[in-house]
From Swiss-Prot:
This is Solute carrier family 35 member G3. GO terms for cellular component: membrane. The chain crosses the membrane at residues 37-57, 67-87, 105-125, 160-180, 190-210, 221-241, 250-270, 281-301, 305-325. It comes from Pan paniscus. Residues 49-174, 272-325 form the EamA domain.
């Protein structure tokens, strides 16, 4: 037969064969979280959840031993100082490269201002409300600052999630603001909300400054500088503005140690996350701190949680779900060789 002749069995050069199908990949090779998704997950699990314990534990230490906010800030800053050993082992300068040292100090100063305002607010305002105001203001300010200074826009889903977080903030804090007591108590409560708001603004600006720092040991350097700046500022202020108090019982010491460790973990995770994802989205995901703080406020501090608090926390969780689902993308790791 003609088809059996070698001439007819040769491939037709005028009609090239279709390209071969790409090799099949395992499920863990086909799909992996993007950088933005990884950053948001780290912010959610490592930044927001541990930070939710900090406010209630700080309030417990204050109720048990009347521990002032500046002293609690000093104890927390002490947990940052051992990072100097890591920098020395790596051969990195403790204060960062000389050309960006001033920005690193400014970032550390903003972090300390944010933390100090948060610790002061949680002593006069319920822990959940203080966390809500701080995270809500940081979310809004991060979105505005990043849009104006970095020209980094957000998608429609991201804006929907941000607006949802703000709505949750209004639902939680709104009823409390309308029922402020007259006199000294009402003034202190209003000042507590103002401190929480200013703490959120300082946090958003600090995250933006941190994103502008580009050197290998950026995170440990800023963490060490935050502890150093916090000690230099809060130790003199403690003796001038407040009265030093030594924790008197095991509960107070346990709260102080837990606050220092959990706050350092949250600080590290947020610093990593903000280099991977939009600062406004990171701040929005950190609203998980509000949910944890409200739960601990009810079960540990035995403080009343209003229905509006539960509703606002639900709205915030739904907004976090929208942002996370929007950024939950997959990247193919295998490339077909041509």
């Amino acid at each position: 037969m003609a088809g059996s002749h070698p001439y007819f069995n040769q491939p037709d050069s005028t009609h090239p064969s279709p390209p071969s199908a790409p090799p099949s990949l395992h499920w863990y090779q086909r799909c992996q979280p993007s950088d933005a998704t990884s950053g948001l997950l780290v912010a959610l699990l490592g930044g927001g959840l541990p930070a939710g314990f900090v406010g209630p534990l700080s309030r417990m230490a204050y109720q048990a031993s009347n521990l002032p906010s500046l002293e609690l800030l000093i104890w927390r800053c002490l947990f940052h100082l051992p990072i100097a050993l890591l920098l020395k082992l790596r051969g990195d300068p403790l204060l960062g490269p000389p050309d960006i040292r001033s920005r690193a100090f400014f970032c550390a100063l903003l972090n300390i201002l944010s933390i100090g305002c948060a610790y002061s607010a949680v002593q006069v305002v319920p822990a959940g409300n203080a966390a809500t105001v701080r995270k809500g203001s940081s979310t809004v300010c991060s979105a505005v600052l990043t849009l104006c200074l970095e020209s980094q826009g957000l998608s429609g889903y991201d804006w929907c999630g941000l607006l949802g977080c703000i709505l949750g903030l209004i639902i939680i804090v709104g009823p409390g603001l309308w029922t402020l007591q007259e006199g000294t108590t009402g003034v202190y409560t209003a000042l507590g909300y103002a401190e929480a708001f200013l703490g959120g603004r300082a946090l958003s600006l600090g995250l933006l400054v941190y994103r502008s720092l580009h050197f290998p040991s950026c995170l440990p350097t800023v963490a060490f500088l935050s502890g150093l700046v916090g000690l230099l500022g809060s130790v003199p202020g403690l003796f001038v503005l407040q009265t030093p108090v030594l924790p008197s019982d095991l509960l107070s010491w346990s709260c102080v140690g837990a606050v220092g460790i959990l706050a350092l973990v949250s600080f590290t995770c947020v610093g990593y996350a903000v280099t991977k994802a939009h600062p406004a989205l990171v701040c929005a995901v950190l609203h998980s701190e509000v949910v944890v703080a409200l739960i601990l406020q009810y079960y540990m501090l035995h403080e009343t949680v209003a229905p509006s608090d539960i509703m606002g926390a639900g709205v915030a969780l739904g907004s976090i779900a929208i942002i996370t689902a929007r950024n939950l993308s997959c990247e193919r790791t295998g490339k077909v060789e041509e």
